[in-house]
Curated annotation (Swiss-Prot):
Belongs to the bacterial ribosomal protein bL27 family. This is Large ribosomal subunit protein bL27. The gene is rpmA. It holds the Pfam family Ribosomal_L27. GO terms for molecular function: structural constituent of ribosome. It comes from Bradyrhizobium sp. (strain ORS 278). It comes from the Bacteria. One of its GO terms (cellular component) is cytosolic large ribosomal subunit. GO terms for biological process: translation. Residues 1-21 are annotated as: Disordered. Keywords: Ribonucleoprotein, Ribosomal protein. InterPro entries: Ribosomal_bL27 (IPR001684), Ribosomal_bL27_CS (IPR018261).
């Protein structure tokens, strides 16, 4: 008699969830201390002035100010430029 071999279970069909990496505060955006500027794996972007880096390479603001991107020596740095305080009226 002709028999069909039992179909095995597929070894494909799995996928991991997206990790929501990338820039969270773009150039020109105002940030306050502790705001996350970028989530990344490795150092796609490097911390510049007034920016800290977490153990998972997350970049965050250390002061209140405006986010700036600048390139130097084949690297992209992210800095936070302080905003001049408003004159009291």
């Amino acid at each position: 008699m002709a028999h069909k071999k039992a179909g095995g279970s597929s070894r494909n069909g799995r996928d991991s969830k997206g990790k929501r990496l990338g820039i969270k505060a773009f150039g020109g955006e105002r940030v306050i201390p502790g705001n996350i500027i970028a989530r990344q794996r490795g150092t796609t972007w490097h911390p510049g002035l007034n920016v800290g880096m977490g153990t998972d390479h997350t970049l965050f603001a250390k002061i209140e100010g405006v986010v700036e991107f600048h390139d130097r020596a084949n690297r992209t740095f992210i800095s936070v430029r302080p905003v001049a305080a408003q004159a009291a009226e």
